[in-house]
Amino acid sequence: MPWPSRKRDKGAVADKKEPDAKIAKTEEETEDKEEEEKSTKPPAGSSKSGLKNWKKAKESDSGGEESKITYCHWLLKSEPESRLEKGVDVKFSIEDLKAQPNQTTFWEGVRNYQARNFLRAMKLGQQAFFYHSNCKEPGIVGIVKIVKEAYPDHTQFDQKDPHYDSSSRKENPKWSMVDVQFVRMTKRFIPLSEIKTHHLAHKADGGPLKNMMLFSRQRLSIQPLTQEEFDFVLSLEEEKPH
């Protein structure tokens, strides 16, 4: 099936209403480079125990440890407003998804190791929140489902694509993507600010959102959700906006 050209973030993005989470692109690239080096080279002068720990960390980076965890639901961030990256507009809103053939598309362009591992852990039929990010009012706008589990992201091999990775090889691809299909819009827009209010209350007094990754790992564009987190956030669509 032919797909129109559209791109998302690199897998790590901060929302405009969370300035403390913003990290310069060069710093983000440095972090990913350091993470890659850690996954391929053992520390110099490692003891036997140190080498053993490094091997465990390497398994985790390659998806070994995290991908074994069964998550029920997900949160996928995408940018609804135009932004050029290497001359290509990376805008992709939920309306863009609805306009795709069969309201289905591949979720490509993730270039963060932890986000990639979460993609690889996704199972057929699991649902995810579609989250508008890096915009004036970030938040949840709809629900999608996984219709194809992780497979190699073709954009890593396309030199004209902003997410091209010259270090990736077709015989051992670094990056993966999944296919997602539109399920429905949420009954109302659920803003980040409202979710954060509940997160802070639950963090203080206990509740399903106390450990929500949306606030502990703000930069990740692919995030897991527990059943309790998903159910609570979804219940907010029934309430009047604060």
UniProtKB/Swiss-Prot annotation:
Tissue: Expressed at high levels in bursa of fabricus, thymus and spleen. Also found in the liver, intestine, heart and brain.
Residue ranges of the motif Nuclear localization signal: 6-10
Record note on modification: Undergoes proteolytic processing during lymphocyte apoptosis.
Alphabetized InterPro entries for the sequence: 5hmC_binding, EVE_domain, PUA-like_sf, THYN1-like_EVE
Pfam families attached to this UniProt entry: EVE
Source superkingdom: Eukaryota
Keyword Ribosomal protein tagged: no
Location of this chain's protein in the cell: Nucleus
Residue span of region Disordered: 1-64
CDD domains per the UniProt record, alphabetical: EVE
Acidic residues composition bias: residue spans: 28-37
Function summary: Specifically binds 5-hydroxymethylcytosine (5hmC), suggesting that it acts as a specific reader of 5hmC.
Protein's recorded name: Thymocyte nuclear protein 1
Annotated source species: Gallus gallus
